[in-house]
Amino acid sequence: MTVSGGVQTGRWLGQRRQSTAEAIGMTEKLLAVGTRKGLFIGRERGGTWAFDESPYFNAQAVYSVAIDTRGARPRLLAGGDSAHWGPSVFHSDDLGRTWTEPAQPAVKFPKDTGASLERVWQLHPAAAEPDVVYAGTEPAALYRSEDRGESFELVRPLWEHPTRSKWVPGGGGEGLHTVLTDKRDPRAVTVAVSTAGVFRTADGGASWEPSNSGVSAVFLPDPNPEFGQCVHKVARDAADPDRLYLQNHWGVYTSDDAGTHWTDIGEGLPSTFGFATAAHPHRGGTAYVFPINADADRVPAGHRCRVFRTADAGKSWEPLTAGLPQEDHYGTVLRDAMCTDDADPAGVYFGNRNGEVYASADDGDSWRQLASHLPDVLCVRAAVVA
């Protein structure tokens, strides 16, 4: 791994060291970068980032990471996929320095489904239930844990939804890649599936309905179906939980009614194709996207590394380029490879398929490169931890 921009490599991952934050009660920023060949963890104190010297799970692709800061002690979760042993979910209670894999698979399909787990696409700590974690998988399914991610149970009503027989895989497989919970109501859950679209429950998962009105499916004979959209990612607004942002396979949308109706907000972007979207952690109406040229040309729009930000819920967009390469850039950002932390000003982060990781400590106004020459970056998560 190559590091730059005021970043220093950390000590060997097997050594347990006391951080400055632990020693004097300070907080630090934690950055987890899941790649095609392991999980890289960076820690920031006093403006300096230090990456642990070697990756965790270096023989596995890490498709999903969660940093659960709800309890007295943060817990990290990672969805790894070993070419030999298959997929698994690991957890760490010491900020990623050591990891535990349950004796029995945390996520598995019941025998009567006839399905087998291919990978865990999403790990999501519930907003209103302290011990609940959701997992989204491939084949597309939703799982619920009530022990902070050590064991999960299949949410059968979604698995058995009447439309399931008509779901088809997207280019990256048939994955449930987005889970959003509502801090106002633990029974309200929104998920997104590629390629099936957005589905919602208002009764804790007992029943589900498609929520794709206004979202296009340009590749289907009917471009406005009830379900079947290739939704790439959905994020929830910080100030208004009913406002959502959606990056589609062609099209960027917002909803002001929790997904009942969607409005196209792509005007002002150089392309409406892309994978990633993220919401500002505190500021309402503020979200980020990373435009890609086209579905047949999956490189940054105009070959320039540009994050676009809206501060008015999609009425206008501004490019954020300070510190980012603007010539001959080909690093595509995947759906879970952009995120924000919960700092103020907010940290914004993304990694790309060139193995580069960039970070902003000022809401996206300026950027610096944290790492280069990593394996293909699949997911990025960050948080302020004690």
Question: Which residue stretches match the model-derived regions?
Answer:
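Extracellular glycan-interacting surfaces
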Residues: 2-386
